[in-house]
C-alpha cells in the first residue's frame, strides 16, 4: 500500500492505493481508501502538510498489515463454472520439486560462480538460469537438452532464455569445467563439513551408439560389455559418498593412468592434500600406491589374493593365525561353531614390494564363504547340464560363467576324426573353494587399528552407488551429443546433479533411499487455480515434511497465493 495525492485548483486529496498484477499480467493499481483533503485533515489533526503526510503514511502501513493478515487467514473463495470451457493453451500443471534442489544450488553459490565465468566471456544469455535448469532437469526429467528445455517450462519459474542459448552455454561450461568443480568443492563447506580425510576413487565408462571411433570415443572394455566406442570417467568422492571431482579420458586408455592427473588437480586447485586414498584392486597399481604414500597422504586398497607372490598367497590361504576382529582373540577357522558364523576374522603381516613397505590384511567371513559356496553349487548344477548335453559356449566373457567348470578332451583312434569329450573340472572347483570367504586389503598405515582400516575399505560401495545413480536414475549416457565440448558439459551437468542430490539427501540425514527421494521430488507438482494461486497436488508424507524443515520453506498448504509462491521461490534462493 502507498499514499497518492490528487491536486485540483482549490484542494489536495490523499488516498491509499494498492498495486497489483491483473489477469493480463500488467501492473496496475486501485484505490483502497480516501483519507480526505489537506484542509480537512489539517484541521482534524491540528498539523501542517508534513504532519498530514506522516499520518497518511502510517495509515497506509496499518492498512498493509491488515491486508496481509486478512490474506493469511482468509478462506479463499474461487468460483468455478461447470458450463464454461477451459481456455486454449493455458498451462495448468507446474513442477515444484526443483525448489528443494534450488536451495542446494544457491547454497553452493553457483550463481556467483556463473557471474565470475561471465566476466571472462562475451555472451548475453543467463548462464545461471541455464546451468540451474540443466541440473534440476537432469535429476527430475533426464533426457536430451531440447527435452530438458521443454521440461523446464513446467517449472514454477520457467526459462527466460531460448534453446539455442543452451547449446551455446555448453561450450562455455566445458571450458570452465575445472574451475566449477573447484569452486563448488570450496563452497560446499557452507552446507556442512566434508569428510575429505577419506577419498574414494573409481572409474566407469559410457558407450556411444556409433560405429567408428571419434575423438575421445575409443574402443575399450565396456562395463556393459557393449562393442561400441566408449568414454571413460574417473570420479573422486569423499568419505560420505559425496562427489568431489571427476575427469574424462579416452576409452582405450588404461584406467590406472587416470588417477594422477585428477589427484594432482585436487592437490593444486582444491587445497585438499591430507587424505587416505581408497580404491579397488583395479586402481591399486604400485605407481598409484607410491603416489599416495607421499606427503600427508596414505592408501587403503583391496588386493587380489590370486595375484600375490606365491609365498604370500600360501600364507593367506592357510586357516591358521586368524584372530576375531571384535576382541583380537586367536581362533582356529576349522573349529568354528554356529555362534561364530556371524563374526569376522583377520590376520596381517608386513608386505614389502620393490617400492613400498606395506601391510597385508586378510579377512575371513564364514557368512560370505557360505554365500559363495551356495552360488557355486547352483553354477555347478548348470555346468553338469552342459556336460550332459555336450554343449558349451565357444566364447565365455563372464568370469562367473558356469562353463568355467567344464573342460574338454579330444579322444580319437588312429586315423579317425577327434571326438570332443566334456567333463566337470573338479580341480577348478577345488581351487576356487580355497578362496571362499577370504578378502585382502593392503595399506601403508602400519600401526592403525585393523577394524578402522576395514571400515574405510567397506565404504567403497558409496562410489559404486554414485555411478549407479548417474547411469540409471540420471540417464547420464549422452546419446544426443557428438561435439567434445558439449559431451564434457553434459558430464559436468551430471556430476553437479549428483552433487546436489547427495547434499540434499545428506541434509535429510540419509533417512531415505535414492528411489524414495527421487520419487518424492518428481511428484511435487502444483495446479494453477484460476490465476489466483496454486494448489499442491502431491501427497504429504514424512519425507515432504523433512524436506520443508531442511530447506526452511513450506509448499504443502491447501492453497498458496501468488504472493506466497514468490516468497517461497525467494526463500529457496536464500543462502
How should each PLM-predicted stretch be described?
Residues 1-128:
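Conserved glycine(s) in the ABC-transporter nucleotide-binding domain "signature"
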Amino acid at each position: 500500500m502507498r499514499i497518492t495525492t490528487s491536486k485540483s485548483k482549490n484542494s489536495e486529496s490523499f488516498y491509499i492505493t494498492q498495486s497489483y498484477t491483473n489477469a493480463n499480467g500488467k501492473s496496475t493499481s486501485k484505490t483502497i481508501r480516501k483519507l480526505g483533503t489537506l484542509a480537512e485533515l489539517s484541521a482534524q489533526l491540528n498539523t501542517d502538510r508534513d504532519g498530514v503526510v506522516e499520518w497518511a503514511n502510517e495509515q497506509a502501513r496499518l492498512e498493509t498489515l491488515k491486508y496481509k493478515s486478512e490474506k493469511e487467514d482468509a478462506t479463499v473463495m474461487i468460483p468455478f463454472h461447470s458450463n464454461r470451457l477451459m481456455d486454449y493453451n493455458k498451462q495448468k500443471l507446474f513442477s515444484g520439486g526443483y525448489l528443494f534442489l534450488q536451495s542446494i544450488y544457491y547454497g553452493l553459490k553457483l550463481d556467483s560462480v556463473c557471474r565470475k565465468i561471465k566476466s571472462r566471456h562475451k555472451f548475453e544469455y543467463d548462464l545461471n538460469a541455464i546451468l540451474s535448469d540443466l541440473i534440476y532437469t537432469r535429476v527430475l526429467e533426464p533426457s536430451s537438452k531440447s527435452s530438458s528445455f521443454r521440461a523446464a517450462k513446467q517449472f514454477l519459474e520457467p526459462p527466460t532464455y531460448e534453446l539455442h542459448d543452451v547449446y551455446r552455454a555448453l561450450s562455455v561450461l566445458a571450458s570452465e569445467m575445472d574451475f566449477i568443480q573447484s569452486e563448488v568443492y570450496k563452497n560446499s563447506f557452507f552446507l556442512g563439513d566434508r569428510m575429505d580425510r577419506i577419498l574414494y576413487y573409481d572409474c566407469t565408462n559410457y558407450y556411444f551408439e556409433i560405429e567408428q571411433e571419434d575423438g575421445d570415443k575409443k574402443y575399450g572394455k565396456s562395463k556393459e560389455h557393449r562393442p561400441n566406442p566408449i568414454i571413460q570417467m574417473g570420479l573422486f568422492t569423499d568419505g560420505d559418498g559425496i562427489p568431489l571431482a571427476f575427469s574424462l579420458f579416452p576409452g582405450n586408455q588404461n584406467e590406472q593412468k587416470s588417477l594422477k592427473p585428477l589427484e594432482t588437480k585436487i592437490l593444486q586447485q582444491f587445497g585438499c592434500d591430507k587424505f587416505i586414498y581408497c580404491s579397488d584392486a583395479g586402481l591399486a597399481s604400485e605407481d598409484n600406491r607410491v603416489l599416495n604414500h607421499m606427503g600427508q597422504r596414505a592408501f587403503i586398497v583391496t588386493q587380489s589374493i590370486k595375484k600375490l607372490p606365491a609365498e604370500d598367497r600360501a600364507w593367506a590361504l592357510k586357516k591358521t593365525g586368524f584372530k576375531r576382529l571384535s576382541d583380537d582373540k586367536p581362533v582356529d577357522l576349522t573349529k568354528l561353531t554356529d555362534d561364530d558364523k556371524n563374526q569376522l576374522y583377520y590376520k596381517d603381516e608386513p608386505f614389502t614390494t620393490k617400492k613400498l613397505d606395506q601391510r597385508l590384511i586378510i579377512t575371513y567371513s564364514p557368512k560370505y564363504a557360505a554365500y559363495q559356496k551356495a552360488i557355486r553349487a547352483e553354477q555347478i548344477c548348470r555346468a553338469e547340464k552342459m556336460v550332459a548335453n555336450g554343449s558349451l559356449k565357444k566364447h565365455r566373457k563372464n568370469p562367473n560363467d558356469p562353463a568355467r567348470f567344464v573342460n574338454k578332451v579330444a579322444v580319437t583312434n588312429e586315423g579317425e576324426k577327434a571326438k570332443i569329450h566334456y567333463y566337470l573340472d573338479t580341480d577348478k572347483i577345488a581351487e576356487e573353494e580355497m578362496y571362499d570367504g577370504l578378502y585382502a586389503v593392503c595399506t601403508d598405515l602400519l600401526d592403525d587399528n585393523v577394524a578402522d582400516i576395514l571400515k574405510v575399505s567397506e565404504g567403497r560401495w558409496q562410489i559404486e552407488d554414485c555411478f549407479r545413480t548417474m547411469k540409471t536414475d540420471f540417464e547420464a549416457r549422452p546419446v544426443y551429443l557428438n561435439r567434445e565440448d558439449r559431451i564434457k558439459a553434459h558430464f559436468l551437468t551430471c556430476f553437479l546433479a549428483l552433487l546436489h542430490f547427495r547434499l540434499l539427501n545428506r541434509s535429510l540425514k540419509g533417512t531415505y533411499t535414492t528411489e524414495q527421494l527421487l520419487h518424492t521430488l518428481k511428484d511435487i507438482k502444483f495446479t494453477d487455480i484460476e490465476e489466483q494461486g496454486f494448489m499442491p497436488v502431491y501427497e504429504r508424507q514424512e519425507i515432504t515434511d523433512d524436506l520443508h524443515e531442511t530447506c526452511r520453506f513450506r509448499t504443502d498448504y491447501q492453497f498458496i497465493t501468488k504472493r506466497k509462491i514468490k516468497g517461497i521461490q525467494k526463500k529457496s534462493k536464500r543462502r
